[in-house]
Amino acid sequence: MTPIVDFQIAARNLTRHTRRNLFLGGALAAVTALLVLLGALTGGMEAAMMESATTLLTGHVNVGGFFKITSASTAPLVSSYPKVLEEVRREVPEIAWVSVRGRGWAKAVSESTSMDLVLGGVEVANEPTFPRVLRVKEGRLEDLGQPGTVLLFEGQADRLKVRVNDVITLSAPTDRGVNNTADVRVAAIARNVGLLSAFSAFIEARTLNQLYGLNAATTGAIHLYLEDPSDAPAVASRLRAGLAKAGWRVMDPEAQPYWMKLMQTVPSEDWTGQKLDVTTADDEMGQFKQFILALRVVTAFLVVILMVVV
């Protein structure tokens, strides 16, 4: 048969089975649309989670550390951080910007109730992504730059029953075994950002240092934001080697968030003084990365089901 005859036969079959062909074409179009929608939804959720996490929780690469007065005591501190930052800038020319963050934990007490908070000490003027990620419901984000201020999330403010300009008391254990307290004013209340905002609050950096009795050259971690986030593993490896060569003691890489090391790993290690800990966003995100992986698995499973249906 000639190609023309084949084409004529195919055309007659299509015209004789119009309803079936329309149904099949509609099913293919619907499944294709669902696959595109599912991919866009998954990609959007993952991108939003990563942006929120790398704003509130971690940098692309982090230079944190632990300071031990005795082998049994541990504090998440980086002493003499300006010197560390100077070496970091030499080793990592790919840095887009740097955020210096204090790390702490405190019990927040209002007039009616209390709750535990993980505190991040920030200099809000040096946090370019805060205005994009944090949606302020009450107050002004800029006011977090004033001494003695704290930013709470909506769920925390509801639980503590406080509003902007109310005062709460923070009680925090220090590495010397005593509890310090500080009265802080609620400068702003931001809308919740999922699980990330359930336990974290932000306090003006100098206020956090005063709460813990730390000097101005001490911080919790240096968050590095890179021009290309995919370079983070290579940058972290290079930075560990560079800091060790420059004379700092550097911990071996371990894919755990700092708070797990603080509670489980470091207290049992027999050393004192300062050690630096270089991590990536994947290391610090821990369970959040597991959630993203589960989301990808569910997406792949749904794609297979849709393809089988077709």
Question: Over which residues does each language-model region extend?
Answer:
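Hydrophobic alpha-helical transmembrane segments of multi-pass inner-membrane transport and secretion
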Residues: 18-45, 289-310
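Hydrophobic, regular-secondary-structure patches
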Residues: 33-118, 145-146
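Short, membrane-interfacial amphipathic segments enriched in basic
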Residues: 1-8, 274-278
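Cytosolic juxtamembrane amphipathic/interface segments immediately preceding
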Residues: 8-17
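Peri-transmembrane interface segments
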Residues: 251-308
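Short acidic/glycine-enriched loop/turn elements at secondary-structure junctions
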Residues: 84-187, 207-214
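Basic-flanked hydrophobic alpha-helices used for secretion and membrane insertion
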Residues: 162-266, 270
